[in-house]
Curated annotation (Swiss-Prot):
Belongs to the CDPF1 family. Pfam families: C6_DPF (PF10170). This is Cysteine-rich DPF motif domain-containing protein 1. It comes from the Eukaryota.
Length: 124
């Protein structure tokens, strides 16, 4: 068999907030073919389709550390502050976050489209 073959997808990642779907090839903190990279959280990862370099990858998302729902890394759906948090959990627990995060969330509110998209799609 040819060892240079592309990795087969392990499954399909789906953000439970915005509905983004993409095939992932690895879940964890140390993606294959990377020598010195360790991700700070267990993440859904895919090989970067825009480069032939096997060491390049894209982080699709991970699980919210509070509610455990799968969320993408998009700013409309989650944030990383020592751990990954979905924006609904951040908003519910906003006072527990540092002032900088609280101020950042205040700036994001008028731009947040994630929850309005969710309401439009009654299938999920």
């Amino acid at each position: 068999m040819d060892s240079s073959k592309e990795p087969e997808p392990t499954g399909e990642f789906k953000c439970q907030l915005c509905g983004l779907t993409a095939p992932y090839t690895y879940y964890g903190q140390k993606p294959p073919n990377t020598h010195s990279i360790v991700i700070l959280e267990d993440s859904y990862v895919m090989k970067d389709p825009f480069t032939p370099d096997k060491e390049k990858f894209l982080i699709l998302g991970s699980l919210c550390s509070l509610c455990r729902r799968a969320v993408c890394v998009g700013a409309e759906c989650s944030l990383f502050y020592t751990k990954r948090f979905c924006l609904p959990c951040v908003n519910e627990n906003l006072q527990a976050f540092p002032l900088e995060i609280q101020e950042d969330m205040d700036k994001r509110k008028p731009q947040s489209k994630c929850l309005t998209r969710k309401k439009k799609d009654s299938r999920t």
